[in-house]
Regions:
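Short intrinsically disordered, low-complexity coil segments enriched in acidic
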Residues: 1-2, 96
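Short S/T/G/P-rich N-terminal loop/turn motif that feeds into the first structured element of a domain
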Residues: 2-71, 78-88, 101-156
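A short, acidic, amphipathic alpha-helical segment used as a generic capping/interface helix at domain edges
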Residues: 91-97
């Protein structure tokens, strides 16, 4: 009888689901007369998310190269819990309300597998959301507490 153990899987080979990282792309279109005010609101929301959401690993606001009124929030979440926190974070709730006044389109795509409960909670927002569940692959995303994160940020 062998006492050998199976080799440990590398940490980036994690099962996909509620505890795995995922990508969210939110596309929004701004009313032309509201562009300056919208940009200020988006920047305030971005800074607040950075200060309050440890589970948000990547958060950028990107302008479409062909339409100066179309923007994309590119977001990477640590897990489902990070998204659920994001959805109830007061600065984000305020920004979503502001988008309702200053924007005229908002749609979301999620790349990665979320739990059924998370999808139900997120879909209850009424925003059009398309879910792309993971079939296979891996993630090397590190959390802020990892050694690599400190190296990337210039903090040994």
């Amino acid at each position: 009888m062998s006492t050998a153990t199976a080799p440990k899987k590398p940490e980036h080979e994690i099962p996909f689901g509620a505890d795995s990282p995922f990508i969210l792309i939110a596309r929004c279109h701004v009313k032309e007369e509201c562009l300056d005010e919208y940009m200020k609101a988006a920047e305030i929301a971005d800074k607040a998310v950075m200060a309050t959401e440890d589970g948000m690993l990547h958060h950028t606001f990107d302008q479409d190269p062909d339409d100066p009124l179309m923007f994309t929030w590119s977001e990477v979440y640590k897990n489902d819990a990070a998204l659920l926190f994001h959805l109830t974070n007061p600065p984000l709730v305020k920004f979503v309300e502001q988008h309702g006044e200053m924007g005229d389109k908002f749609e979301i795509e999620v790349y990665g597998t979320l739990s059924v409960e998370t999808k139900e909670a997120f879909s209850a927002s009424g925003i059009p959301i398309k879910y792309f569940d993971t079939k296979f692959g891996y993630s090397r995303i590190k959390t802020r507490k990892s050694k690599m994160w400190g190296v990337l940020c210039g903090k040994p």
